[in-house]
Amino acid sequence: IYDLKALKKSPKKLTMTNPANAEEAKACVEAGIDLFVLGNKEIEPFREVAPTHFMGAASIFAQFGSKSEIIDDAFDKMRRGADMYYTLRSFDVMESLVNEGIPVQSHIGLIPTFSHYCGGLRGWGRSSEEAMKIFETIKRMEDIGVTAVEAECIAEEVLDSINLKTSVVTFSLGSGSSGDVIMSFVADICGQDSEEDKPPKHAHAFGNVGKLIKKVHKERVSALSAFNSEVKKNNFPYPETNISMHPGEKEKFMSKLDKWTPVHQ
């Protein structure tokens, strides 16, 4: 947490992404990614492959009804290896978590969970009025002790203008390069979307994992189809895949088999 806050006075940028499983986490570690956000996942498998990485964990918005349940969940995740707790709940809940000594991350700008009554999935802060609302929100979070925010799809001029006016660490997701940490999703970075999908504006594919996954799937279907076909034609198992008795043992076995009688009648 101390190192994150020190980014405000440094030109250094850190990277953050959201591995979905231990395999993706291992790839992130090997690639040098600095920070993980795990969401509402089990933490232990990620800690096995990334024991020293900074990891944020979360509860989904409607997972718990009461403040006490949220606090209990936050403590549980911290015990299991989380370094910070993400929540979209009220300022009161955030402040209560802070008062318990839990580093809190929240969210400003586009919040997909609430997009259905905020004009859909769109850019935020494109008007001066909305930009001021974003600034006032992050300052309110600062006042209650929030450590960090995900700044999603905010006009780059806005984050550039407010980032040094707050002590809250900013994780920029589609909000320009002024964030203290630059975040993107593993699926977007690796190009896991299919050609038919329309990725969000802020997404940039640095790889072609989606095409490779499709190729692997096609190859898997081809192999399974060939197996199914060969069995149905009575061609498989092939002679070279079978096990044979030692020379002369079949004759002995057949002789014993012919002479066999039940022990119990």
Map each language-model feature to its residues:
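Alpha/beta enzyme core
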Residues: 1-265
